[in-house]
Amino acid sequence: METKAPHLDARLAACAAYVRPGARVADVGCDHGKLAARLALEGCRVIGTDIHAAPLETARATCAAAGCADRVDLRLGDGLAPLEAGEADDIVMAGISAETILHILDAAGWVRRKGIRLILCAATKTPLLRRELCRRGFALEDETPVVAAGRVYTVLCAGYTGEEREPDGEFCLVGLSAAKPHAARLRDDTAAKLKNSCADCAAGNNRKPGGCWPGCAGWN
């Protein structure tokens, strides 16, 4: 039977590019299952998780249509909770907030092991994600800025080293993306968000800890 790999947008394609050949992959918040199906067709074993049952059914249909349902294990649950330590080498989280990504990582202590690769694309607050990864002993290995649906996103590739550090504001803002395609647009977008965030801080409207940007009074 002829199979057809699902089309991936720029964000998911960049995530897929960081997955190691033949890896055991956890696709957290797998949603429609397109990334899981594509990776399975490329030779990976995939565990897809989602906190809601409906997206898992959509993912199941996607994988069946692609002819790879036998290589994708879909599990209902929050974040990495449905997995046991040792079941995944590469962990993908895309389309969720930085705070949610950090919550998921904090709840799964087994991810703090050398050799596990994190592939992360936060929907919001990438500077916060960079900072908190460094504080938790993870090191950024590479980044890819992409444009999807008219917005610039950055896909981070990171691994655990155990060396906790406090990155400076410049690193939090641009990370390893300074010389990459779309870097200029990324800087412009980041500068605009920084300006708005500083204005919110000055007005006392910043309600979320860590919700500011480097240089803001609330950046803690």
Residue spans of the language-model regions?
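S-adenosyl-L-methionine
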Residues: M1-G22, A37, E57-A85
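Class I S-adenosyl-L-methionine
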Residues: E2-A10, E99-N220
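Conserved class I S-adenosyl-L-methionine
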Residues: G22-D31
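Conserved SAM-binding loop of SAM-dependent methyltransferases across substrates and taxa
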Residues: H32-C44
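Conserved SAM-binding motif I beta-strand of class I
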Residues: R45-D50
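Conserved SAM/SAH-binding beta-strand->alpha-helix loop
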Residues: H52-A54
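Short SAM/SAH-binding signature in class I
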Residues: A88-G95
